UniProtKB/Swiss-Prot annotation:
Organism in which the protein naturally occurs: Yersinia pestis
Ranges for domain 4Fe-4S ferredoxin-type: 50-80, 90-119
Binding site for [4Fe-4S] cluster 1: C60, C63, C66, C109
Catalysed reaction, written as an equation: a quinone + NADH + 5 H(+)(in) = a quinol + NAD(+) + 4 H(+)(out)
Residues at which [4Fe-4S] cluster 2 binds: C70, C99, C102, C105
Gene: nuoI
Protein name: NADH-quinone oxidoreductase subunit I
Amino acid sequence: MTLKELVVGFGTQVRSLWMIGLHAFHKRETLMYPEEPVYLPPRYRGRIVLTRDPDGEERCVACNLCAVACPVGCISLQKAEQKDGRWYPEFFRINFSRCIFCGLCEEACPTTAIQLTPDFEMGEFKRQDLVYEKEDLLISGPGKYPEYNFYRMAGMAIDGKQKGEAENEAKPIDVKGLMP
């Protein structure tokens, strides 16, 4: 080892100690997580939930658009039909171990049944526990859109009345009849 190498090595050690001394008294960036809450942006996309409409029914009509829009294929569902003709998912399953929380399922949902909440604490010890069924995903409230009801907005038959036959509702316009 030459004298030059010894001086350079000593200089790097002094420089390292100087940097440690400078940063020893700065404010720390590490948060003590459970005690200090983490800042989440206003539109943070976290845990996925299934919501209900204002009448208390499931909003999901099992259209399968969320499963098609999902880039990793973590959503699976099966359509069933009630006696009144309304569709609902017989089973609805999300595998959160594969989900990338991109929000495409929420954007694709025409009934606003799927919504992403800011909840991010979903750690499990076993991978199988990250597969959520419909009962785990359903919440009791309407979520972000409390007044929205898909069947009323879509003009589906409600209580046996077709579109335009309910109270204070105009008859639908025949778009094809207006064409030249």
